Amino acid sequence: MTEMRSAKIMSGRVFAGARALYRAAGVSGDDMGKKPIIAIANSFDEFLPGHVHLNKVGRIVSEAIKEAGGIPREFNTMAVDDGIAMGHTGMLYSLPSRDIIADTVEYQCNAHCADALICIPNCDKVVPGMLMAALRLNIPTVFVSGGPMEAGTTVLADGTVKSTDLIDVMYATADDSVSDEELLNYEKTVCPTCGSCAGMFTANSMNCLTEAIGLALPGNGTILASHSYRKDLFERAAKQVVKIAHQYYDDSDDSVLPRSIATKEAFENAMTMDVAMGGSTNTVLHILAMAQSADVDFTLDDIERISHTVPCICKASPSGKWEISDVHRAGGITGILGELDRAGKLHTNVHSIDYPTLEAKLADWDIMRPTCTEEAQQMYKAAPGHIISPEPWTHTTLFDSLDRDRTNGAIHDIDHPEIHEGGLAVLRGNLAPDGCVVKTAGVPPEIWKFRGPALVVDSQEQAIEVILNDTLKPGMALVIRYEGPKGGPGMQEMLYPTSFVKGKGIGKQVAMLTDGRYSGGSSGLAIGHMAPEAANKGPVALIRNGDIIDIDIEARSVNVELTDEQLDERRRELEAGDGYVAHRNRHVSQALKAYAAFARSADKGATRDPELINKLSGLD
């Protein structure tokens, strides 16, 4: 038996005050020291459709924990909506919020001696922030997200009915052929329900990744927020966290702990799945940060290795025609994992919060196997209800059948990939010696090789200006620098630039490169995370208008056609002048300056520099 963390304050005279406060908060004296305290890390807020319903989720989870024999204690973290923060200085705060969320969960659980944890995230930075905290804390933990929203249904001016999502309205804003009335129609219809934005954007990619790494139950990444099966998932997750808490404390079974589950093999599995489904490039940042929190040696080199050997077998929006509900109908994350397993691409001996091995889980949940349970087959029939409402679990709509077509369906088998290269790739060259990332699943084949003159800007705002005023021409490479973790600071997403080039009709004729990030909703030849960043003396700071940029995705290369001697000469000129300073007008708050002071480059997950922190604090 392992002593519960809460035991230290649940007995003895010295902690009578702590117990008095717990009693005042509603904890029964009869339960103190006998039942595990289960922290519920919720992220409800009314700014985000992905989180607007999570207060109701918290109540469901709390009641289920009580019924299962735990003591639920709920608290909230912040949640930044990238779609609302996008395109203005609000986006500077998005990535830094990830680390603050991780701190919040760590602080709350350690300050109050929580025995176990259930996390209720949904949107972009909340999922990785909570994952980082869980891996730091290493107490029994289960994740259950709020779920994806349904895709929209928009009737176009010509009467065509189109499946839409948030990215469609952003494309339309820069398309001069779309009238204000048509734009308003998009605005009203592309986001019909609560939930994280439809499509394989960052939020849904991260919720799928959590399932793949073993810290969430099947369906976590793909059951729609509007479907009644999502409510069932919340109840099952709540019971599971109490179960594994008892396994750890009553049976001393440390296999249920996050660090026992999220091993290097599990990280490799999760990244393999991510590459196969063409997830958001932001997942690269977050999985690197998670690995550091878990003390797992998993680096950009591992991601590069995986991307060379795993094809893309699932292309959901924005890279393809399929929506998240289509991926769910095809078997969801266990469907993708099943195909990867049959191709010998996974470590099947890893375990999860609910199964002793991945092999055992796939036997029950992979819809292509004869052993797949009736429960699994029924769950994967959960379909959109096509009801416009912010309320969750409003319907019980089911597909008539499952999508088992592995040649032309939403999930392909390894012999019929969407593209033979992985959906994500790491590029290197004299422009990014420490690496950069591109979502290959979203790059048209005709521009996998690109060569053209650079148009250089020092901010996202300047990038938007040169796109909308038509300074950016077909054949050019738009270089957006000083937007990295330090240089931004905050490593902004560039969804507006990628959306606007499509709205202008040149999305297949230009390249974009940045030391910042791209949204999970971005597609096209959009290369991000260039390391070292400009503010860290990276070569991208040396580029000038007209320099020839050469990109070859198949060769995994990104270069500027300058010699080492020419780059060295430019570096000397720059350092003799203003140095590595962005030419723009931007106010940076004290909070963002504090983030910038400790931020490492993208190839390290844009995490805080532990060596610098230790040096300045004087603490080990």
From Swiss-Prot:
One of its GO terms (biological process) is isoleucine biosynthetic process. The active site is at S519 (proton acceptor). GO terms for molecular function: 2 iron, 2 sulfur cluster binding; dihydroxy-acid dehydratase activity; magnesium ion binding. Pathway: Amino-acid biosynthesis; L-isoleucine biosynthesis; L-isoleucine from 2-oxobutanoate: step 3/4; Amino-acid biosynthesis; L-valine biosynthesis; L-valine from pyruvate: step 3/4. Keywords: 2Fe-2S, Amino-acid biosynthesis, Branched-chain amino acid biosynthesis, Iron, Iron-sulfur, Lyase, Magnesium, Metal-binding. Binds 1 [2Fe-2S] cluster per subunit. This cluster acts as a Lewis acid cofactor. Its EC number is 4.2.1.9. InterPro entries: Dihydro-acid_dehy_C, DihydroxyA_deHydtase, DiOHA_6PGluconate_deHydtase_CS, ILV_EDD_C, ILV_EDD_N, IlvD/EDD_N. Transmembrane segments: none annotated. Its cofactor is [2Fe-2S] cluster; Mg(2+). It catalyses: (2R)-2,3-dihydroxy-3-methylbutanoate = 3-methyl-2-oxobutanoate + H2O; (2R,3R)-2,3-dihydroxy-3-methylpentanoate = (S)-3-methyl-2-oxopentanoate + H2O. Pfam families: ILV_EDD_C, ILVD_EDD_N. [2Fe-2S] cluster binds at C123, C197. GO terms for cellular component: cytosol. The modification N6-carboxylysine is found at K125. Belongs to the IlvD/Edd family. Homodimer. NCBIfam families: ilvD, PRK12448.1. HAMAP family: IlvD. This is Dihydroxy-acid dehydratase.
